[in-house]
A protein has these predicted regions:
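H-loop/switch region of ABC-family ATPase nucleotide-binding domains
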Residues: 111-112
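Helix N-cap at the start of a conserved alpha-helix in ABC-type nucleotide-binding domains
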Residues: 87-88
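A short, surface-exposed alpha-helical micro-motif characterized by mixed small hydrophobic
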Residues: 117-119
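Catalytic Walker B motif of ABC-type/P-loop ATPase nucleotide-binding domains
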Residues: 76-79
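Conserved ABC ATPase "signature" region
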Residues: 19, 23, 31-47
Length: 156
């Protein structure tokens, strides 16, 4: 699970947080593997050993993504995972999610970024007041059509 606001231990470093949460999940990685995971999630090498309380929201989000990926789950639940990420990091996240999906993982993501969803996911569901009002395959709708559908359902 990757929440919109990742809760990390502020006085631990990024790599210490990753190591801690991996161990809680029964994963005991060496330092090189932990670094590889953080790099794959877009965190800069120079930031690995900085305390998390000095991180931006986007940097904390990258550590949260790394924690989820390190657990090697079959199902990932994401709540606004690109929140706080710059456009490059958001594109990197999309690539990571596509790779996970292609390797057989199921991904359920809540997001208001309908354009990112379209390029990342296979299916789209639109919720309104907690109810699924529209479901479609991403290959069956253009970006403009998706925008129009979203606007139509969000009126009122």
């Amino acid at each position: 699970y990757i929440p919109e606001n990742v809760n990390l231990y502020p006085y631990l470093t990024g790599i210490e947080n990753l190591d801690y949460f991996c161990r809680l999940a029964g994963k005991n990685y060496n330092q090189e593997k932990l670094k590889e995971i953080l790099l794959d999630c877009g965190l800069d090498l120079i930031d690995f050993d900085k305390k998390v309380n000095t991180y931006s929201k986007g940097m904390r989000q990258k550590v949260g993504i790394a924690i989820a990926l390190a657990k090697e789950a079959n199902i990932y639940l994401l709540d606004e995972p690109a929140s706080g990420l710059d456009p490059l990091a958001s594109t990197e996240l999309s690539s990571i999610l596509k790779n996970l999906s292609n390797s057989g993982a199921a991904i359920l993501m809540a997001s208001h970024d309908i354009f990112r969803i379209r390029e990342t996911c296979n299916r789209i569901g639109i919720l309104k007041n907690g109810e699924l009002v529209k479901e479609m395959d991403t290959t069956s709708v253009t970006t403009k059509e998706l925008e129009n559908i979203y606007i139509e359902y969000m009126k009122d």
